[in-house]
């Protein structure tokens, strides 16, 4: 059982931060198949899991031949893949709201690169604009009654953000410019660059060329 997007509130859904990427995910193991669980029964895990892992896992359990183009890993069963120490994530267009974000996380720190930093987190997406909460937010923004943190949702983003989601679950303290996090930021930048080149990310092309 899983959701298809992050928190369904403004700033969550459709945004390239942990708040937008993270979804609930539950696996139920009947008595007959509980031996397939590497985590035990009735427990939770902080293992890094991606939607990319679902197809390889199901194909493996069904005894099928694994297509070479699949990128995920097998989560459970005899062919379970080793755990990963980081996940690479992406967020792009949502309906009429263009965007392009690439992210890497180790489970605690989340580094996101906003290629369209001129687009605010609360960018105009028609589907969301008809909701009452978004209308109230825009009205308060226009009336200048929001505090700086609240206003930031309607202002251009920083090109890079680095959040410690263990100590900052709402992702409001960007650590990217702090000297004590410079080494970590550099490692995450390099990892993301290498991943983008390895995967040959086609969404860097204009949409009309895809």
Walk through the language-model features, giving the residues of each.
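Short, solvent-exposed loop/turn and secondary-structure capping segments
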Residues: 10-15, 38, 60, 123-124, ...
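C-terminal, low-complexity/hydrophilic appendages and adjacent surface loops
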Residues: 18, 94-177, 206
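Beta-strand elements within well-structured catalytic alpha/beta cores of enzymes
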Residues: 1-3, 24-27, 54-59, 162-168
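Short, solvent-exposed turn/loop segments enriched in Gly/Ser/Thr/Pro and often Arg
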Residues: 3-9, 15, 191-210
